[in-house]
């Protein structure tokens, strides 16, 4: 059997890491197109916008709530008109998936900046596409992972704790799905079987959350960045991302996809 493991090009995490965004974007060209959640545009971007603009020209466009084919097409037109050299997604999971899909449509590099640690989507070569009404439509499997994933732990610590807890719940399933795939010889997102590395990372993700999750929750409730919170952010984002993508998916994700058809789950 052949196993395949895939990774993002670069993972950066730490307190006020968003101040590094401009330097990372400049590695790809002189103009960056920022796809942002409306909250990010109003409340968070002013914190680090000056540092970004010191390195590259930026074009900012708010994201319209759903990662749909229609939204990706709309944004791709604007990115092309701006002659941007890199797409940057800043916000929650759907905004980030939209940025990945938009960059893929144009063959551009993409930088992913999650503002919450609620999912393991940021590191993956995958966008989950919904209808404009928010019903799961399909997985868009991309040819490569994001070029850069940049996580500002200060921003994550200031977000409502329910987002961190959602990420913990998501990440806890990673080990069980990877284990189920190993036992059944099921393929991962590449179609090959998962590697030993992916399974170990999925297990380490589970262990990290059990050891540090409670303290990380308290840290987030107090809006304070602590070593425990940093570890859980990394587990929710990087370890879970590598674990699900290269370890494989099972019943947990299938259940989620079906639940999106129920209006009360949105």
Segments (PLM) and residue ranges:
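A glycine/threonine-rich phosphate-anchoring loop and its flanking beta-alpha core
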Residues: 9, 104-197
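Electropositive phosphate-/nucleotide-binding environments in soluble metabolic enzymes
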Residues: 11-19, 42, 46, 69, ...
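Alpha-helical scaffold segments in soluble metabolic enzymes
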Residues: 20-24, 47, 74, 101, ...
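Short glycine/serine/threonine-rich phosphate/pyrophosphate-binding segments
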Residues: 18, 41-45, 69, 94-101, ...
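A short, small-residue-rich loop immediately preceding and capping a beta-strand
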Residues: 79-102, 106-115
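ATP/NTP phosphate-donor binding region
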Residues: 1-86
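Active-site segments that bind and position negatively charged phosphate/pyrophosphate groups
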Residues: 189-266
């Amino acid at each position: 059997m052949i196993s395949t493991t895939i990774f993002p090009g670069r993972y950066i995490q730490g307190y006020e890491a968003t101040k590094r965004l401009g330097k990372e974007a400049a590695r790809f060209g002189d103009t960056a197109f920022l796809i942002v959640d409306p909250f990010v545009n109003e409340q968070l971007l002013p914190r680090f916008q000056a540092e970004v603009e010191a390195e590259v020209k930026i074009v900012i466009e708010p994201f319209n709530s759903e990662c749909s084919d229609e939204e990706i097409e709309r944004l791709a037109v604007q990115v092309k008109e701006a002659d941007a050299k890199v797409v940057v997604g800043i916000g929650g999971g759907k905004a980030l998936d939209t940025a990945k899909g938009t960059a893929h449509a144009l063959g551009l590099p993409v930088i992913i900046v999650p503002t919450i640690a609620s999912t393991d989507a940021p590191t993956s070569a995958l966008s989950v596409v919904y209808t404009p009404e928010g019903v799961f439509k399909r997985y868009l499997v991309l040819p490569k992972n994001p070029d850069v994933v940049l996580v500002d732990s200060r921003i994550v610590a200031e977000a409502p704790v329910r987002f961190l807890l959602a990420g913990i719940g998501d990440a806890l399933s990673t080990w069980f799905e990877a284990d189920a795939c190993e036992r059944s010889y099921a393929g991962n997102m590449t179609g090959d079987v998962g590697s030993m590395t992916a399974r170990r990372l999925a297990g380490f993700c589970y262990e990290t959350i059990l050891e540090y999750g409670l303290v990380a929750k308290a840290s987030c409730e107090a809006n304070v960045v602590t070593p425990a919170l940093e570890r859980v952010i990394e587990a929710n984002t990087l370890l879970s991302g590598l674990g699900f993508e290269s370890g494989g998916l099972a019943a947990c994700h299938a259940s989620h996809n079906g639940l999106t058809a129920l209006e009360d789950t949105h």
